């Protein structure tokens, strides 16, 4: 059983008082637990719609909560299943029309709400939040919004009873460095910025390494470049079942201890 921290208890308490809650906490601190506590371990007191930015995240949440035996549905544009479940995982765009027309849930959770400032998707987020029915409580979650208090003030100007809950302690300390600070001298055969950077970081014992790419194609291309360039003295051995699960292309790359991850992969491959 997870014992919630004080800030998580404060957020849940505010929700139970009927307030909108804007949570600002670092990645991994436990923002999702606020909703899970409100949901009473899968037995929520009303209808909840938990929105996430991508279909991949929606599928992950669906699988996670269903594995606990929770009654969960999903709506992501390409998939609509069990829409009347007490908990619905969705992309926000699939819910926008319902919210604007006053058909909102008891609680709308917007995970990674910093997308309100996104050039392409921000308008949908802003409209959904601004026009959500007053009977729908809002729970906004993020760790990368510079001015969460401004968001609270904006919600209050809309006539909503909103509060901010902040937690600044990172579960894992964050350290920053620059490629020039890495001391490892590269073999001449390693070419390209990212293969060189990864080789240096691994030599300085900074692995595992996670690199974010802007598009699916970039993700696979970058992974191939790194896999081809890095020395591989200890190939990863995969079973026949594992190779069949992820497919030949990704399996071959995994043997070099390099992989890619995006929404185009099956849930089993991503897991």
Regions found by a protein language model. Give the residues of each.
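Inter-Walker segment of RecA-like/P-loop motor cores
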Residues: 59, 64-104, 166-171, 176-179
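Conserved pre-motif I regulatory segment
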Residues: 1-24
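Conserved SF1/SF2 helicase motif Ia
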Residues: 24-26, 34-60, 133-135
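Conserved C-terminal RecA-like helicase domain
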Residues: 49-52, 56-62, 66-74, 212-271
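SF2 helicase catalytic motif II
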Residues: 92-95, 99-139
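Motif I (Walker A/P-loop) of helicase-class P-loop NTPases
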Residues: 30-40, 121-126
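Short hydrophobic/aromatic beta-strand immediately N-terminal to the Walker A/P-loop
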Residues: 21-24, 49, 139, 210-212
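Conserved interdomain linker/interface between the two RecA-like ATPase lobes of SF2 helicase motors
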Residues: 113, 127-131, 136-139, 144-225, ...
